[in-house]
Amino acid sequence: MVQEAQHHPIDAVITWVDGLDPAHLKKRKSVMGSAPNLFHENAINPHRWACNGELYFCLASLEHNAPWLRKIWIVVDAQSPDLSGLSAALRAKIQLVDHTEIFANYGAILPTFNSLAIETFLWNIPGLSDQFIYFNDDVFLTSPCQPSDFYTMNGSILRGTWADFSSLEDDPVQMADPVKFNHYMQINAAALCGVSSQRLFRTAHVAHPCLRPTMAQLHSRFAAAFRANAGYRMRDIRQFSPQSLHNHACILNKTATVNSVKDHFHIYSGQGVGAVDGTIAALLQNIDETPDIKMLCINDLPQLEALYPDIRGWLAQAVTGAPRSSSTE
């Protein structure tokens, strides 16, 4: 029986970047140099640094569906997102934290353009709560949530599936496939914990409830691996997923519960492209009509907008809880 959590302060952490900012673009080009072929295709896709307004929807979803959050930390690289359209109450919860702060004592690693490197030290944010929920800015809450949707007295509530990735190991064709890149990040994380690729926990594209003390303990245990992971300025096939490492450690330590209800949906990049008209509308209507859905990830909002021009209107209604069935009819 899952025990309800005694609710401690819970923060949210969101990573954000504006890749078209001239200063950021200049730094990125200096790292990539004239030989982008040295990096994995997954690492240099410009979509990784695109800013398409997702942050606003993510923040609005937290205000409407998780008002109990204590603070919302936005991790930035000498940038400031426009928060002027948000309510005063929501802005009061938000605090920007720069890469220089989370990489304290590791300054030589900067600048970095690698989300995996950044995620490696999110737990190092000064003043962060022991329980924190990590969001990519393309993840949104679409229904009211409670702390008990993320934590129990035993620890974190994880979302994902058990998977066998053993066929991917040492396969150069698969290793070069940008779609499979995330699989290798999870293989590497599981291996660090001594978990076989034949049965590892494949973390879903969701909001990730994290335990800061667990990440600190993992850092103490695997200090060299953490530093190496953070040292890649661009994504690299040798890296591990910090979320996956955290989740496998929690499973092994019995400080995690795997959610038995699929309460999330992932619209991946390329989904619906080339499909018959009405495919995306039907998909969105299915999300509308599924009461269990509490989280939504949209990997490529501009691509989805080209297929369904009213997606921003639909998403605005989805994250605020307004009736939205008519928007997909």
What residue ranges belong to the model's regions?
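Long, low-complexity C-terminal extensions of enzymes
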Residues: 237, 245-329
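Short beta-strand/loop segment that forms part of the nucleotide-sugar
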Residues: 70-79
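GT-A fold catalytic core of metal-dependent nucleotide-sugar glycosyltransferases
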Residues: 80-81, 121-165
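Short, acidic, metal-binding catalytic loop of nucleotide-sugar glycosyltransferases
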Residues: 61-69
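A solvent-exposed, charged loop/short amphipathic helix patch at secondary-structure junctions
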Residues: 9, 19-48, 160
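Short catalytic/ligand-binding loop motif for oxyanion handling, primarily in non-cytosolic enzymes
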Residues: 20-24, 80-85, 104-105, 140-144, ...
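Long, charge-rich alpha-helical interaction segments
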Residues: 157-233, 237
